[in-house]
Amino acid sequence: SCLFIAMAGFDTPVISGVMEGYGAEAAGLQAGDRIIKMNNYNIHFYQEVTVYNYFHNGEAVDVVYERDGDKHTAHITPIYSDELGKYLIGINGNLDRQKGNIFEVLEYGAYEVKYQIYITINSLKMLFTGQLGVKDMSGPVAIVDTISDVYEQSIIDGVFYVIVNMLSIAILLSANLGVMNLLPLPALDGGRIFLIFIELVRGKKLKAEVEGFINMVGFAMLMALMVFVMYNDITKLIK
């Protein structure tokens, strides 16, 4: 992530303009204001503003922003845009990326990882709550296809953009794998941690055959899910 930030830079959550007739204008936000927090989520990139609104579609939000060194809080209720087909709080941001020194690279590299983990966790929430279907999941086949598409689009602008975009994909995949591996499912590290917790609560170890059976069933379920996801990927490609 630090290499990505060093090469691509980072954008800042500074408002470039306020849309007429939306909540941000009514709350008094202005161009030049820097968004610091949305509800309890700290904002470091402008793209986090967009992603937060996506995962909290239509929900009112308390926005903490900075103007001339002073912090202010605005309560904003999103308004539905028929033209765009989604709820908007009514702000625009400048997505131009800036380069930082070594300390900023380390700092924003950590923020980038946090951002990708946030996306992964909230995507899983949408999956488990039914906002996304199992068919929306993507596996190795879809990932390879995406990488191929990104490469073909990036190489037009040069090798530098290929490297930057591949690094971005690598960060996203790493965050996904890290979060998935910590899920409390048998055959994953999260499942092992869960079993250890059960043993601590019970005050004694599980029998080896019981633990082995649990892991075997969990592994079989994971393999079945992988086959389904790969089938889903191939079906999408054929269509």
Predicted regions: what is each one?
Residues 8-11, 184, 232-239:
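Juxtamembrane transmembrane-helix termini
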